[in-house]
Amino acid sequence: ESALERRSSSVVMNNVMKKPDLSDPKLRAKLAKGMGRNYYGEPAWPNDLLYMFPVCILGTFAAIVGLAVMQPTPTGEPANPFATPLEILPEWYFFPTFNLLRVIPNKLLGVLSMAAVPAGLITVPFIENVNKFQNPFRRPVATSVFLLGTVVAIWLGIGATLPIDKAISLGFW
């Protein structure tokens, strides 16, 4: 390790570990406006880790327990092992893929269309050659693919709950 590397690492560490200068008038003006917490170098330990995180965790836990007590999950009718239901639906997050397989008549084409989704998503970064840390709204291809995919997934998900003849049109036409 050279002397320059040691000096630059010590400068970085001094800037990171530097205590705030409370006699600085600019800092005092910001503190007076209420911009003090963690803005001027207040350490995360013990303030945030011992006080704020447990409050947030317990608040989230209390909200979940409260919602579970006030609105319990209803249980459906008991399953009859001797009768198959007319329409078997998957869990809600499988509705778009279920509907895609259901409406495409050729099963191989249905499976290939499902495989085309991740393959298409993999190609998006190569199509759009911009800085990956740029604002997402300045990445038109990725934003368009995301919005179109969301609309199609919602459309197919709603269609999965309808009969097969209305699965694509949703009964609009």
From Swiss-Prot:
Q: Where is the transit peptide?
A: 1-14
**Entry's Gene Ontology BP terms:** mitochondrial electron transport, ubiquinol to cytochrome c; photosynthetic electron transport chain
Lineage of origin: Eukaryota, Discoba, Euglenozoa, Euglenida, Spirocuta
Q: What role is this protein assigned? A: Component of the cytochrome b6-f complex, which mediates electron transfer between photosystem II (PSII) and photosystem I (PSI), cyclic electron flow around PSI, and state transitions.
**Keyword check for Thylakoid:** yes
Name residues in a coiled coil: none
How does the protein's chain sit in the membrane according to the entry? Multi-pass membrane protein
Q: How does it assemble?
A: The 4 large subunits of the cytochrome b6-f complex are cytochrome b6, subunit IV (17 kDa polypeptide, petD), cytochrome f and the Rieske protein, while the 4 small subunits are petG, petL, petM and petN. The complex functions as a dimer.
Transmembrane feature ranges: 49-69, 108-128, 144-164
Entry annotated with the keyword Plastid: yes
State the protein's name.
Cytochrome b6-f complex subunit 4, chloroplastic
